């Protein structure tokens, strides 16, 4: 059987979510790089995979899927039984299943809207404006942190009663928190979690999982302007870039290219080339397309 294909880049939170559940179930997969800042996700080839021109694209044989949380559920339903995992709670009682559904919705509707603006302001804006010329919008950060504290207070109360959000076993709901929280914990506001000891302990349990470590190992925490190399680092090793990505085979006008530093190998897996003002406008319009 051919491995499933994930189209995107492992630094993106939605791509990382899909990779995380593939790693949890031990499924074989191929990661196909997509240069999103160069606009490859808007080209016809990718739009055939994802009509909304977002990432990831996901292909399993002739079957195409979109939306990272839906893809993750597909992965668990197809491969979770073989791996002995019931992260969706579908083999448990109706109450357990309901709790997984509830906290999955809480993550998407309450937690994500509170935490993502902080990540965007502290990581994305400085990343796409060369030289660090764009300071975070402190009003947005402060308002988001206030909202996040309200959510974390509810989480703290919940985790005083159970080991994980949906009960005493880890679930789909818990693991969906990984991508954005990972980046949040690299910001100056990570200490907010120290105010909620049960939440902090829960987060540390999640980060201790081998699958989580394999995926987060390739989610960069350092962004620098460097020369380009020819590999894409993934949880399954380095994937050579396509010939078209080889600067020796492609003539381009001089431009500043921002790259991400793979923390595990110190190699440079990707380059982004776009005028900073255009990139900033695009990011503000659709921040989820960047992380």
Curated annotation (Swiss-Prot):
Cross-referenced SUPFAM superfamilies? GST C-terminal domain-like, Thioredoxin-like
Catalysed reaction(s) here are: RX + glutathione = an S-substituted glutathione + a halide anion + H(+)
Q: What class of enzyme is it?
A: transferase
Which keywords accompany this UniProt record?
Transferase
The record's annotation in Gene3D superfamilies points to:
1.20.1050.10, Glutaredoxin (3.40.30.10)
* GO biological process terms held by the UniProt record: glutathione metabolic process; response to toxic substance
Has the keyword Transferase been applied to this entry? yes
The stretch of residues making up the signal peptide is none
Give the E.C. number(s).
2.5.1.18
Which positions fall inside the GST C-terminal domain?
93-223
Residues annotated as binding glutathione: 41-42, 54-55, 67-68
Any one cellular-component term (Gene Ontology): cytoplasm
Kindly give the InterPro entries that the UniProt entry links to this protein.
Answer: Glutathione-S-Trfase_C-like, Glutathione-S-Trfase_C_sf, Glutathione_S-Trfase, Glutathione_S-Trfase_N, GST_C, GST_Phi_C, Thioredoxin-like_sf
Q: Where is the GST N-terminal domain?
A: 2-83
Among the GO molecular function terms of this UniProt record, one is: glutathione transferase activity
As a miscellaneous remark, the entry gives:
GSTA2 is said to be a defective gene.
| Family membership | Belongs to the GST superfamily. Phi family.
Task performed by this protein: Conjugation of reduced glutathione to a wide number of exogenous and endogenous hydrophobic electrophiles.
Q: What is this protein called?
A: Glutathione S-transferase 2
- The protein's organism comes out as Triticum aestivum (Wheat)
């Amino acid at each position: 059987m051919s491995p499933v294909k994930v189209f995107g880049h492992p630094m993106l939170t939605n791509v990382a979510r899909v990779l995380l559940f593939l790693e949890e179930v031990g499924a074989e997969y191929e990661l196909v790089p997509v240069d999103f800042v160069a606009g490859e996700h808007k080209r016809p080839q990718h739009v055939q995979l994802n009509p909304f021109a977002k990432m990831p694209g996901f292909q399993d044989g002739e079957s195409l899927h979109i939306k990272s949380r839906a893809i993750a559920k597909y992965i668990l339903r197809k491969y979770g039984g073989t791996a002995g995992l019931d992260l969706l709670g579908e083999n448990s009682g109706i109450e357990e299943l309901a709790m997984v559904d509830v906290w999955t919705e809480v993550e998407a509707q309450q937690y994500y809207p509170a935490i993502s603006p902080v990540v965007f302001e502290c990581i994305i804006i400085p990343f796409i404006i060369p030289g660090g010329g764009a300071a975070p919008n402190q009003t947005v950060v402060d308002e988001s942190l206030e909202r996040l504290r309200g959510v974390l207070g509810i989480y703290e109360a919940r985790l005083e009663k159970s080991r994980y959000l949906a009960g005493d076993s880890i679930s789909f709901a818990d693991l969906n928190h990984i991508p954005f929280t990972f980046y949040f914990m690299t910001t100056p506001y990570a200490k907010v979690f120290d105010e909620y000891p049960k939440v902090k302990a829960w987060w540390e349990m999640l980060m201790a999982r081998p699958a989580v470590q394999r995926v987060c190992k390739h989610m960069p925490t350092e962004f620098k302007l460097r020369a380009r190399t020819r590999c894409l680092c993934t949880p399954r090793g380095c994937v050579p870039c396509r010939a078209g990505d080889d600067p020796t085979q492609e003539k381009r006008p001089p431009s500043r290219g921002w790259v991400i530093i793979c923390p595990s190998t110190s190699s440079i897996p990707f380059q982004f080339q776009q005028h900073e003002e255009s990139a900033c406008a695009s990011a503000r319009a659709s921040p989820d397309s960047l992380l």
